[in-house]
């Protein structure tokens, strides 16, 4: 029996199939779990309004296949950020968060990975950061009351580009229900000291994403998607050695 649970992101599986089939494929491929996506598309946002019957159907598929959905990648806040200048957009951000937590409760999802963006399609300023903080404080309080963990992804933008940067938010929010969900690709693209970053956050890492990236330099903006494993900047062997030395026992 391996020490770590190994999961697959929903978007790595066929799109237009049932959840029963999706979980069955993951099982046949040797994965332990699937991470569900609630992104900024209307199609996946609609999952937040699934009926009781639809939720029960997925719960039954989880039980019948033995493949769990312990985590949700909630990237919808890229479209509806807490830090937005637009009040309607901010209201939608709160609504999305509330519905996502309820969906997590219903499906047994323990960790919601949230995007570390104060804003994405707007310019950042002190106001966007302040509103993001208000949103995070509210969201973590709601998640905590439902025993759901909110884990911030290390992102493809500088605002949340390292565990060091996330740590400043951890010191502000100060909750066991507010953790970090590093992506080794994003972390490596922005930072030369990946081992030190992992050491800094080891006590609050909920899970880890694995992908390769091209590094951000003075002459290159980096590439955060669609980089074949082994062709990018991530030193996977060294990352795994560091995590083993830190006694990391979470999922990948």
Regions found by a protein language model. Name each.
Residues 35-63, 116-123:
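Glycine-rich, proline-tolerant flexible connector loops at the mouths of alpha/beta enzymes
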Residues 20-21, 27, 61-65, 80-180:
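Active-site acidic/histidine proton-transfer and metal-coordination neighborhood
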Residues 41-46, 78-84, 118-125, 189-191, ...:
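A short acidic, helix-capping loop that chelates divalent metal ions and anchors anionic groups
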Residues 9-13, 37-41, 74-77, 117-119, ...:
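Active-site beta-loop-alpha junctions enriched in small/polar residues
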Residues 5, 127, 134-233, 240:
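Acidic/histidine-rich catalytic cores of soluble enzymes
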Residues 31, 67, 104, 109, ...:
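A structural motif
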Residues 8, 26, 34, 62, ...:
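Conserved, mostly hydrophobic/aromatic
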Residues 4-10, 34-36, 69-74, 112-114, ...:
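Hydrophobic faces of well-ordered beta-strands that scaffold small-molecule active sites
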């Amino acid at each position: 029996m391996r020490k770590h649970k190994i999961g697959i992101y929903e978007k790595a599986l066929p799109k237009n199939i049932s959840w029963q089939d999706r979980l069955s494929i993951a099982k046949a491929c040797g994965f332990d779990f699937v991470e569900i996506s609630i992104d900024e598309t209307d199609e996946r946002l609609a999952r937040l309004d699934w009926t009781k019957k639809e939720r029960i159907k997925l719960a039954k598929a989880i039980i019948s296949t033995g493949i769990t959905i312990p985590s949700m990648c909630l990237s919808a806040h890229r479209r509806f950020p807490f830090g937005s200048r637009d009040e309607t957009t901010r209201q939608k951000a709160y609504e999305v968060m509330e519905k996502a937590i309820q969906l997590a409760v219903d499906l047994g999802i323990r960790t919601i990975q949230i995007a570390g963006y104060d804003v994405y399609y707007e310019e950042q300023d002190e106001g966007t950061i302040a509103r993001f903080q208000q949103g995070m404080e509210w969201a973590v309080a709601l998640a905590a009351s439902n025993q759901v963990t909110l884990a911030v992804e290390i992102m493809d933008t500088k605002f949340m580009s390292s565990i060091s940067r996330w740590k400043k938010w951890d010191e502000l929010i100060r909750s066991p229900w507010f953790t970090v969900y590093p992506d080794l690709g994003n972390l490596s693209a922005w930072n030369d000291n990946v081992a030190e970053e992992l050491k800094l956050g080891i006590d609050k890492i909920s899970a880890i994403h694995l992908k390769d990236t091209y590094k951000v330099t003075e002459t290159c903006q980096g590439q955060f998607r669609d980089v074949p494993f082994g062709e990018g900047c991530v030193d996977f062997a060294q990352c795994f050695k560091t995590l083993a030395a830190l006694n990391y026992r979470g999922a990948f």
